Amino acid sequence: MRLLEDLPVFQRAHVILVYASLPDEVGTLDFLQRWSEKKQLLLPVVKGDVLELRRCTHLNSLQSGVLKILEPLNEPLFTQYETIDLAIIPGVAFTPDGKRLGRGKGYYDRLLSNPAFRGVYKIGLAFPCQLVTDLPVAPHDVQLNQILTLPSVNSIR
């Protein structure tokens, strides 16, 4: 995550949308722990077909949510999308030009298509194995500004 933390766009950002990682995603839990008191970090909470945003004030305040993703369930709803400076987005696959394949429910595409996100810098975090040359694009798909490819550790038995 140091690659991300060294980016000027991250250093300038005050309000950051990020995700609490699942086991098969680039890990963000240490990042959340390190930055939750220095920057305003927002995490998505699944509510029906939409993602609500809530502030992550401390890792200990997170609970397993609907999809077994850690969520700040007891924090107030965040609605000031226009104040978000940076969005860090997970995915299953990415292309070098910013296309993203999610898990198929469209949660992030619906969230990021909100006009308030138009000026938000969007970064996808990927392992090298998640990079592909091309992905199908639907009209509702939101393209990312940058893909950061982070090293992974593979254990082989």
List each language-model region with its residue ranges.
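Conserved phosphate- and dinucleotide-binding cores of soluble alpha/beta proteins
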Residues: 52-157
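N-terminal active-site beta-alpha-beta segment that forms phosphate/nucleotide-binding
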Residues: 1-82
